[in-house]
């Protein structure tokens, strides 16, 4: 597998991902997507939406506000429990997330347990640590013209609560049959103590989450179905190799406060095995808390009967940036004379690149433009490249991940055929433009 620094270099060189605010020296934990990165990100998010929402009858979309009534985060438990263990070095005063700088410990590690490990500071190498304290990761802001305690609000740390707060609206307006899901894509913000590993752990990210509402007695069968369907999405739609995907059953001590069962779907990233996505059985935790905090009835009445209950919830949740990094790592290939980003055709920023063999020959350029317009009208995501020689163009498109390069040469002027060169095999064939 590729090294992380190789992927980072490719992403900046070819316009996928840049450091956030790069012109001002950057800002830790923030990243900007360039032209190729935006195209890849959009295709990944669209593929997820098509797989989970547009291709199914039981999942519906919502798009909730980023800034919500702060009571939302009281009911969800985030104001009390959304925290990570922070430890500060007594020598250099560097601050770190305790469970990420030592092996074999969890988020619940105590000061005594941590100090007994004699962990060296990643910055100065000393072992003079202060006490561990819990650091709440929500970004706070103020709503309105007065900055006081009454105006405090938060940037959402997850998209899930926007789904839960709209559960009653959806049931009252379209009354879907159980089981049903509500899906959302959008930004989430987490004030990470130690953002690291490129886009794997950052302070601003995009999430894709589903809250799947089920009758309490059916949660186990629905959990297994969703687990299988998520694996299918990752391997068949995203093209990830199954041998790099692993299910980890999360123990009770390490589960989120709302979960009775969690499976972390792990991926073999360049820096090691990390969480790609999670599947959590949230029981009725969220709807019960909303009912208590809001005073609104969250019960679901089964159609055609008097049976009523608060549904239980199963949540598939995936970070878009984590998925993008998995797709990039899966596709990156270093060969003797070139680097190839072997993206699935449906995810590649461009499907075709059209070029004249020589850009100083007007007749070739004119014919190439004609072919370009034909393919662009047919496929949309087609690019034009006449920079440098043809060999350099091939290498550039290989790194971008373009599956096919179409070249117009002097034979095209004679017989109307063009050269189509395959990214993965480098094989070339001649066909008529209308046959592409």
Where do the model's predicted regions map?
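NTP/phosphate- and nucleic-acid-binding module
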Residues: 1-436
